[in-house]
């Protein structure tokens, strides 16, 4: 039986931590664990997911929940609440519904104070890891039999009805993910016609019907070339010399978005080496299975710009293809021949590997994310198969693995700090401190222990890094990468706790550490007033024309985001109230400029585009929260009035809100089909309207939304899992499994606290 382990490092000599692994979450299989009843419960969860997999595609993340609830002997003791049609919501009923969800959610807190949860959904995360450990000869060690069983379960359970796999679990089938998951099944041990429900045969048919893997997008071409089932001459160049360019050039690594930089860093190393894994009998078979013409007759040069229409979200402009062609025809032949291969290419590979090692060490070998992790790990193995660098990477693979009723998947990297920051604010909003003091103390302890205490090591600016001291990451302290909105939410939590008695919530954070957080936030504001996420924005927008991916948008440079800007306003307004003498003028200017930015990016229909959640509902919740924190109201702010009109206009017949993930790639509001509502979207919209003072004008829309949430609460105090709610880079969705608890809880808390209700 699978069990989650919290804040454990084990005895691996290649594993180390900055804070004794606080926030770390890993899974292990224990064949002796669990009672027959517990095992039956897990199996029932798997079967229920499989039966409903085409209706609700994100999992309920039930395995660890069942484990925690069992370990704590949880039993819901508060009677369920039902609000009938036409019945008003009393303060007593709102309180009872709120206490039920607080009681349930508190039982899900881990021993170190955070709330574990899946953050996955993209279907291109796991297959490259399987390919990597296959190439390096570590497949059996990393993924023994029970792991393989769960990997296959995940692949089977998320195969679309047409035989393919989408970019993410709710998406239409794409060549990229269909090819990767087909290869993954074959490596794990399925035959060409094997797999549940004829998975392999159906997938291969989809691939052939859509032109074969010559139509796979560029990242797929890279991975297939590495594996040996594609030829490097069919890929566009990724010269490692890029890492030696002078800093005055507009296209320089320091000016790239950090994730883009970190993906193409190891990719360029592997490309520069033209590395190809061992050509095993399986690789020979895949060369026959994945193409519609003989492998040795393919004109690889012609395949470089090919991309299946199903995968194409960002068509490359002509100027970009022209650049690739020039590099391919003129530059690469020179750099790969003597003497330039010895004078320049060799040096470029050394410089690139120096950057890889620096980033690995700075993140305790977690790296910035799962795509980068696997590429950096493979690059370290290519450099030295028996070296410590690779062994340190192996030790951190468990940090990325997650198991649920739909199988084993690879996480983006973990959302421990992000989820916990919002969970704490939701619980604080309940005003039930007397009932959850221990929960709050543990959460406070986790937040304090998760703050990044130092900048990256050495001359970090020469390695294109920004200050991180005082920040919070998205996941845990070991990850090391500062994020502005995570920092703002962490700071806000610490400030809120500082206003409470330490005998209840524990020792307050010292002011100097709060000042460090403020330094990070102030350093990330752009000239337009907006806040970037990881590093200062400011590179020229035209560089996005060089976006080398086909299925993402806005990935080349750092941008400003409504969510980051709003979170920072919230935090700095509260900080200014508690510490009025610290950098007052700078903070005042920050807030004024940030508000101006929010008002400037509002869409014509009154919403804000959400960059990290679905979509206009999410962005509008953040924006209205930021505006309200800065003193804007419905009466003195046109943007707020337009936003209220927008939200009221899209409220569904049942009182909720429901937005399709298609809003994200299409950049326009798209409702869920069938007049459906989503409880997370409903919570965001409800809180947004409360920020805008809707209760002072007409509380009816708020009552209708609260009624839907109360009546949707399950018997144990949980809420049902519905559609996917997270997104990144416009076109790829993320499943934040904790959202279904955090946001309805928070919305009910704000509703009970701020909307007048009869006793």
From Swiss-Prot:
Q: Which keywords belong to this entry? A: Isomerase, Repeat
Enzyme class, top EC level, equals isomerase
Protein name, entry field: Beta-amyrin synthase
- The UniProt entry annotates PFTB repeats at 148-189, 514-559, 591-631, 640-681
List the catalysed reactions.
Answer: (S)-2,3-epoxysqualene = beta-amyrin
Pathway named in the protein's UniProt entry? Terpene metabolism
- Domain of life according to the entry: Eukaryota
- Family affiliation: Belongs to the terpene cyclase/mutase family.
InterPro entries in the record, alphabetically? Answer: SQ_cyclase_C, SQ_cyclase_N, Squalene_cyclase, Terpenoid_cyclase/PrenylTrfase
């Amino acid at each position: 039986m699978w069990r989650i382990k919290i804040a454990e490092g084990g005895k691996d000599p290649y594993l180390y931590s900055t804070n004794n692994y606080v926030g770390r979450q890993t899974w292990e299989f224990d064949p002796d664990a669990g009672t027959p009843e517990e095992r039956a419960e897990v199996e029932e969860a798997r079967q229920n997911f499989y039966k409903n997999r085409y209706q609700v595609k994100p999992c309920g993340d039930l395995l660890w929940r069942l484990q925690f609830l069992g370990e704590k002997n949880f039993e819901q003791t508060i009677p369920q609440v039902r609000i009938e049609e036409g019945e008003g919501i009393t303060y007593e009923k709102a309180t009872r519904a709120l206490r039920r969800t607080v009681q349930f959610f508190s039982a899900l807190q881990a021993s170190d104070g955070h709330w574990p949860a899946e953050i996955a959904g993209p279907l291109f995360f796991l297959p490259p890891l399987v390919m990597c450990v296959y190439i390096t000869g570590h497949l059996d060690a990393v993924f023994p039999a029970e792991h393989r069983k769960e990997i296959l379960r995940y692949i089977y359970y998320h195969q679309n009805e047409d035989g393919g796999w989408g970019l993410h679990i709710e998406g239409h089938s794409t060549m990229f993910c269909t090819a990767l998951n087909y290869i993954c099944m074959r490596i794990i041990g399925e035959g060409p016609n094997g797999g549940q429900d004829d998975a392999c045969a159906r997938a291969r048919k989809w691939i052939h019907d859509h032109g074969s893997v010559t139509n796979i997008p560029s990242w797929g071409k890279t991975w297939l070339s590495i594996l040996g089932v594609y030829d490097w001459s069919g890929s566009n160049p990724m010269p490692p010399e890029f890492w030696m360019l002078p800093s005055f050039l507009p296209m320089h690594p320091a000016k790239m978005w950090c994730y883009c930089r970190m993906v193409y860093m190891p990719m360029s190393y592997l490309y520069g080496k033209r590395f190809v894994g061992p050509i095993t009998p399986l690789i020979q078979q895949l060369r026959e299975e994945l193409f519609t013409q003989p492998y040795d007759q393919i004109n690889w040069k012609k395949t470089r710009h090919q991309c299946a229409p199903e995968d194409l979200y960002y068509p490359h402009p002509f100027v970009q293809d022209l650049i690739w062609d020039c590099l391919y025809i003129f530059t690469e032949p020179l750099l790969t021949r003597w003497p330039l291969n010895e004078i320049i290419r060799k040096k470029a590979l050394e410089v690139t590997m120096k950057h890889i090692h620096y980033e690995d060490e700075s993140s305790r070998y977690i790296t910035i994310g799962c795509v980068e992790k696997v590429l950096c790990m493979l690059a370290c193995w290519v450099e030295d198969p028996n070296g410590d660098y690779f062994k340190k990477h192996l030790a951190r693979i468990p940090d990325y693995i997650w198991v649920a009723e739909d199988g084993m998947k690879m996480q983006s990297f973990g959302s421990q700090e992000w989820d916990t920051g919002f969970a704490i604010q939701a619980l604080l909003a309940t005003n039930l401190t007397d009932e959850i003091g221990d929960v709050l103390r543990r959460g406070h302890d986790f937040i304090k222990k998760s703050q990044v205490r130092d900048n990256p090591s050495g001359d970090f600016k020469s390695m294109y890094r920004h200050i991180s001291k005082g920040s919070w990451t998205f996941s845990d302290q070991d990850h090391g990468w500062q994020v502005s909105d995570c920092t703002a939410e962490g700071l806000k939590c610490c400030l809120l706790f500082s206003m409470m008695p330490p005998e209840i919530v524990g020792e307050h954070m010292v002011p100097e550490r709060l000042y460090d957080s403020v330094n990070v936030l102030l350093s990330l504001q752009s000239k337009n007033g907006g806040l970037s996420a990881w590093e200062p924005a400011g590179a020229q927008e035209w560089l996005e024309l060089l976006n080398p991916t086909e299925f993402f948008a806005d990935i080349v440079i750092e941008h400003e985001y409504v969510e980051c800007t709003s979170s920072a306003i919230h935090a700095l307004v509260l900080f200014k109230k508690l510490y009025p003498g610290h950098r007052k003028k700078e903070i005042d200017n920050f807030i004024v400029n940030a508000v101006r930015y929010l008002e400037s990016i509002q869409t014509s229909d009154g919403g804000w585009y959400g960059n990290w959640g679905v979509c206009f509902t999410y962005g509008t919740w953040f924006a209205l929260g930021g505006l309200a924190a800065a003193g804007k109201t419905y009466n003195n702010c046109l943007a707020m009035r337009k936003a209220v009109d927008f939200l009221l206009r899209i409220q569904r017949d049942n009182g909720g809100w429901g937005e399709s993930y298609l809003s994200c790639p299409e950049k326009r509001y798209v409702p869920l089909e069938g007049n459906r509502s989503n409880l997370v979207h409903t919570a965001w919209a409800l809180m947004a309207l409360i920020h805008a003072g809707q209760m002072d004008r007409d509380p009816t829309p708020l009552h209708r939304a609260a009624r839907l949430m109360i009546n949707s609460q399950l018997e144990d105090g949980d809420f049902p899992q519905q559609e996917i709610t997270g997104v990144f880079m416009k076109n790829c969705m993320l499943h934040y499994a904790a959202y279904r608890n955090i946001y309805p809880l928070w919305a009910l808390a704000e509703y009970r606290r701020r909307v007048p209700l009869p006793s």
